[in-house]
Regions:
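Metzincin-family zinc-dependent endopeptidase catalytic domain
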Residues: 1-76, 82, 86
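Post-HExxH zinc-binding segment in Zn-dependent metallohydrolases
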Residues: 96-118
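Extracytoplasmic/secreted proteins, especially bacterial periplasmic and envelope-associated proteins
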Residues: 69-70, 74-78, 90, 108-115
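Surface-exposed aromatic
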Residues: 56-62, 91-101
Length: 118
């Protein structure tokens, strides 16, 4: 099952990608933020109203010795979050967390994206 995050306008979104060494034990991370009515940036993970801005962080500390296919999977997974796809437990989805062999969106992912952005 997919869960979606609400974007106000498609053309308001901005995603930045950072590839660096982080001491944490995650491969990749989607870090959404939003601007409030005063223009202040907020990183409150409990606010699901507008995550049209965000950073993707790829952790070289964890993935530097992994295959290029695995690195691509992590990047595609995090980009899925930037398109408002959440984790799901579908075995045939790039959005399933953990070790998977998929490094590109699968049929279910594409269907959910089409439904989300029509």
């Amino acid at each position: 099952m997919f869960h979606f995050l609400k974007f106000q306008k498609k053309n308001d979104s901005q995603v930045r990608v950072y590839v660096s060494y982080y001491s944490q034990f995650w491969d990749g991370q989607w870090e959404p933020y939003y601007t409030d009515s005063k223009g202040n940036l907020n990183f409150d993970g409990n606010n699901f109203e507008d995550w049209s801005l965000g950073n993707i962080r790829l952790n070289l500390q964890q993935i530097k010795n992994r295959s290029s296919s695995f690195k691509k999977k992590v990047a595609v997974h995090e980009f899925g979050h930037s398109l408002s796809l959440a984790h799901n437990m579908d075995d045939v989805s790039v959005m399933k967390p953990g070790e998977l062999s998929f490094n590109e969106p699968q049929k279910a992912d594409k269907t959910h994206l089409k439904n989300r952005w029509k």
